[in-house]
Regions:
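Membrane-proximal intracellular helices of multi-pass ion channels
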Residues: 1-445
Length: 445
């Protein structure tokens, strides 16, 4: 036992994050297997519950059974708890229990919390965590209240539960819906494509949840004084706006030609916003043209922002790479933006993350295409959705076999936990010696 305790003390914060997510997924999968979790009162096979639990904890939204018709009220509640835990982060949830119970947060716990929410420093981490928890529940409550009139009109008292479920699912960028019935499965929000209230509330929840907790802190502290925002917050806000606006304009010009002007604008913006790893859709994605699907695939890979409820490669990663490219084109010695410069380590980390995500995306897509004999473009859309934790699909998820589902499970997990987190968890820090290898030159490009 003493040896076990010593080993636990040596566990790094990155290992705690990686194992924490895995543990919650496994626990959720076991609970969902129970007969009480399914509407038919039967034991659900482990492969289906593992996929569902992974998708919920990793806030993805890909499913192999319809959430609304297959799972009971208890099962849906379990899924919602998994979504909330995954959205906030396992470490944040555990820390919240410690704070509620009055236990002192140790320095090791504070360091782990810092890594979990991508905070710049350990100081003030407990205050920031309290702020995140309070802000999360307040925003989710407001979102649910705003949707009450629509869902209660359509579903009666059941509309209250639907409002709460979809508010949490949207804020956590999870994309799970409970609108399906035995006669119509996997509808997502297609029935509300022309409803301005549902569209706007869901889009706002997705964006607020996906821009990151530190960006919230900047907004609440500095209000509209953007000059005082952190550099990271400025980059996140600009990049998010660009990644929403450009695809929306493209979708408006290339798709939804038969819609009225208002409906077309709503559909274009919603399909763009949901690419920030949300997983809801109001339109038939399979009916969109191939160019739009290609853009959606790329956008899903990018995902949301660091320290947020979203997964994926992250908006800051792509922003750093693009800014570095412009600096290289301009023959600038360093990458600068908003009067600040990046450390070269940031550029190196961004390139590493991008390569890792593209590798997982391509190898996963090719593997599934070979196993299932499905068009590679559809499989790449699916793997981008999984590793970017976006949750959108062209309708092939339920048709895939066990091995392909396991590939998607791994991709969802890697996409939510984060590439560098797993690398740092698997590889210990190397002690640098004083001597360095001789410097040499190599030509690229």
């Amino acid at each position: 036992m003493p040896e076990l305790i010593r080993k636990k003390k040596k566990m790094s914060s990155f290992e705690m994050i990686a194992f924490g997510f895995a543990g919650v997924i496994l626990l959720g999968a076991i609970i969902l297997m129970l007969p009480i979790s399914s509407s038919a009162g039967v034991v659900t096979p482990f492969d289906k519950t593992l996929f569902t639990a992974t998708s919920a904890v990793c806030v993805t939204g890909l499913v192999v059974v319809d959430t609304g018709s297959y799972w009971s009220a208890f099962g849906q509640a379990v899924i919602l708890l998994l979504i909330q835990t995954g959205g906030l982060g396992v470490i944040t949830v555990v820390a919240s229990f410690s704070m509620v119970s009055g236990r002192k947060i140790s320095l090791m716990q504070r360091s782990t919390m810092q890594d979990a929410i991508s905070a710049p420093k350990v100081g003030g981490i407990v205050r920031l965590t309290k702020f995140i928890l309070q802000g999360t529940f307040l925003i989710e409550l407001i979102g649910a209240i705003l949707m009450f009139p629509v869902y209660c009109r359509d579903y009666g008292w059941k509309g209250i539960w639907m409002s709460v479920f979809h508010s949490v699912s949207a804020f956590c960028n999870a994309g799970f819906d409970i609108l399906g019935t035995a006669g119509q499965t996997f509808p997502s929000l297609t029935g509300y494509i022309a409803n301005p209230l549902i569209n706007l509330v869901i889009m706002l929840l997705i964006v607020i949840g996906g821009i990151g907790f530190l960006t919230w802190d900047d907004f609440c502290t500095n209000k509209w004084n953007l000059k005082r925002y952190r550099l990271q917050s400025k980059i996140i806000l600009v990049t998010t706006a660009v990644l929403i606006l450009l695809p929306a304009i493209f979708f408006f010009l290339s798709d939804f030609a038969g819609f009225s002007m208002g409906k077309r604008i709503l559909a274009s913006f919603f399909q763009s916003v949901t690419l920030r790893t949300a997983g809801f859709n109001t339109a038939d994605l399979g009916a969109m043209n191939d160019s739009s699907k290609a853009i959606m695939t790329l956008m899903m890979l990018i995902g949301g922002s660091p320290g947020s409820t979203a997964g994926g490669m992250k908006t800051t990663t792509i922003a750093v790479l693009i800014l570095n490219a412009f600096a290289t084109f301009g023959r600038e010695p360093e990458t600068e933006v908003f009067g600040r410069r990046f450390d070269n380590t940031v550029v190196k980390n961004a390139a590493t993350i991008a390569i890792l995500y593209f590798f997982l995306f391509f190898t996963g897509g090719i593997a599934i295409s070979q196993i299932e004999h499905v068009a590679l473009s559809d499989c790449l859309f699916e793997t981008a959705s999984a590793v970017g934790t976006a949750g959108l699909t062209l309708g092939i998820t339920t048709e895939l076999g066990l091995v392909s589902h396991l590939i998607l499970v791994v991709l969802m997990y890697l996409g939510r936990v984060g590439g560098l987190t797993l690398i740092y968890a698997a590889i210990s820090v190397k002690i640098q010696s004083g001597a360095k290898r001789p410097l040499d030159k190599i030509t690229v490009g």
